Regions:
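Short, surface-exposed glycine/acidic/tryptophan-bearing loops
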Residues: 81-130, 143, 147-177
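Active-site neighborhood of thiol-dependent amide/isopeptide-bond enzymes
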Residues: 136-211
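Intrinsically disordered, low-complexity N-terminal segments that are enriched in acidic
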Residues: 1-102
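Sequence-level detector for tyrosine residue identity
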Residues: 10-15, 39-44, 73-75, 103, ...
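Weak global preference for isoleucine
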Residues: 18-21, 28-30, 46, 51, ...
């Protein structure tokens, strides 16, 4: 995929360019004061030109080319005012031109990888996830309703504690069984398993809130 100029690191930027979307462009400047400097912290909507000089680690992360990492850098990103789960496909998906067809072909390869690797609930957690998230009925009309249901379930049944020790072997299972409170890592991990339970590919990532 890399040889065909496709990467999940700037996938939305490619799609946006082909769709001629009119999202707001913003320049973001980063001053890394405490995070690991060997990685670059960018959003999903970063433009290709801003990440092409970094080391793209498949669909995992972006690594700095600098020997001791990068402290200060900037990039351009495009933000939509709508939640990502509400995004709808562009009309050209049904009748693509040559460039759009090339994108669709490479995206299909990556999509197959995603569904093969990010759609299965971790072994041993299937019944626990089903018990927690299926106890309340909801109208499943797609990804938006599922996202809201997961938020509602976590808010209703789980307790937050930023000081939770996440080092024990069965910490996620204990959290899902409501034996312990959870921090941001456990809430995010539970949400990933829940999305997979509802057949939506998801994976755990770490990041920062940009305000």
């Amino acid at each position: 995929l890399e040889n065909k100029n496709f990467s999940s690191s700037y996938q939305y930027s490619l799609y946006e360019k082909l769709s001629q979307l009119d999202d707001t462009t913003q320049k973001v400047e980063i001053n890394n004061t405490g995070a690991n400097k060997k990685y670059l912290y960018t959003p999903y909507s970063v433009s290709k030109k801003d990440v092409s000089s970094s080391l793209i680690q498949k669909d995992l992360n972006l690594k700095s080319n600098a020997l001791f990492g990068t402290k200060n850098y900037s990039y351009t990103e495009t933000s939509s005012v709508s939640p990502s789960e509400l995004m709808t496909g562009s009309n050209w998906l049904n009748q693509p031109n040559k460039s759009q067809k090339k994108y669709l072909d490479t995206e299909a390869v990556y999509r197959q990888f995603v569904y093969e690797n990010y759609q299965t609930v971790d072994q041993g957690l299937e019944k626990t996830i089903a018990h927690l998230f299926d106890q309340d009925e909801f109208e499943n009309t797609g990804i938006y309703s599922i996202s809201q249901h997961i938020r509602d379930t976590l808010t209703k049944y789980m307790k937050y504690d930023e000081k939770t020790n996440t080092q024990s072997e069965n910490v996620l299972e204990d959290f899902l069984n409501q034996k312990i409170s959870g921090n941001d890592v456990l809430f995010a991990s539970a949400a990933v398993e829940a999305f997979r339970h509802y057949n939506i590919p998801a994976r755990y990532v770490e990041g920062y809130l940009l305000k």
